[in-house]
């Protein structure tokens, strides 16, 4: 059980905007594709792409949900132009996040899998909403016992809080249904995976075992052998993902106000990048 004596990190991005801007400038030089660097009229822009990336991460750290409200803090900054250029940075943000995955050593860590809801409207509008009508649907939020319209984010997090990868599905998709595909796409070197009661089932455990992973989930209280099986240390480690999701919610991962698919992806990627960036700065500085 020595691996369960882990050190948690707060994951708040405690860095000045100047340093954040310098980090984003370095990332841009290293990872930005030529199609982005050498597009037309780049010599005429007043605000660099790296500065826009820094501003997006800064907005997430400030916890400001509305991009329109954030743009009002800056004199002469057009919200529509800022929003359009932010969406152009989506491939770069995606590349940076996956590069961080390769640089962070998670060997020996236990992985935790869970999901969180991303509603795109208030519950009263569940059956009248028109946005994302072909890719979102109605799901159930068990923590608040309410039905919502939107998406569900399935995430894999290390036991000390690094978000390794995620997948977005319709709100109605069951947690266990997305697990195998998410593990296939991620290919983590870690072999131990913790989940909640939503991942119970011999079929899922067998599929993951065939892939080389051991899945542990707590038994429900009314199940036979629950007292013996339910290791309280493992259950405590699994619950740490709740704190990680709470911080992702602060970074606006759950409160996504985008009204286009590209905007939705961009804001979710920024939230995850800000979260993992805070992890790396706190751990390696």
Tell where the protein language model's regions lie, with residue ranges:
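Short alpha-helical elements
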Residues: 1-285
């Amino acid at each position: 059980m020595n691996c369960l004596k882990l050190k948690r990190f707060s994951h708040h991005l405690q860095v000045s905007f100047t340093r954040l801007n310098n980090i984003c400038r370095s990332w841009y030089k290293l990872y930005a594709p030529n199609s982005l660097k050498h597009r037309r009229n780049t010599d005429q822009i007043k605000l660099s792409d790296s500065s826009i990336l820094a501003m997006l991460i800064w907005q997430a750290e400030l916890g400001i949900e509305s991009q329109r409200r954030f743009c009002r803090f800056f004199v002469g900054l057009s919200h529509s132009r800022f929003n359009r250029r932010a969406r152009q940075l989506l491939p770069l943000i995606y590349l940076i996040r996956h590069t961080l995955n390769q640089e962070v050593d998670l060997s020996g860590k236990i992985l935790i899998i869970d999901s969180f809801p991303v509603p795109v409207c208030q519950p009263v509008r569940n059956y009248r909403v028109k946005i994302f009508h072909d890719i979102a649907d109605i799901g159930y939020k068990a923590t608040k016992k309410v039905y919502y319209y939107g998406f569900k984010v399935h995430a894999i997090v290390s036991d000390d809080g690094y978000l390794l990868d995620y997948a977005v599905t319709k709100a109605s998709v069951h947690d266990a249904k997305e697990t195998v595909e998410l593990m296939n796409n991620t290919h983590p070197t870690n072999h131990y995976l913790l989940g909640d009661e939503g991942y119970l089932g011999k079929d899922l455990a067998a599929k993951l075992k065939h892939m080389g992973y051991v899945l542990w989930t707590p038994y429900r209280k009314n199940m036979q052998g629950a007292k013996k099986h339910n290791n309280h240390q493992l259950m405590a480690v699994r619950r740490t993902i709740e704190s990680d999701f709470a911080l992702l919610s602060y970074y606006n991962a759950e409160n996504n106000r985008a009204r286009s698919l590209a905007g939705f992806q961009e804001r979710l990627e920024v939230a995850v990048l800000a979260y993992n960036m805070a992890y790396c700065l706190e751990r390696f500085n």
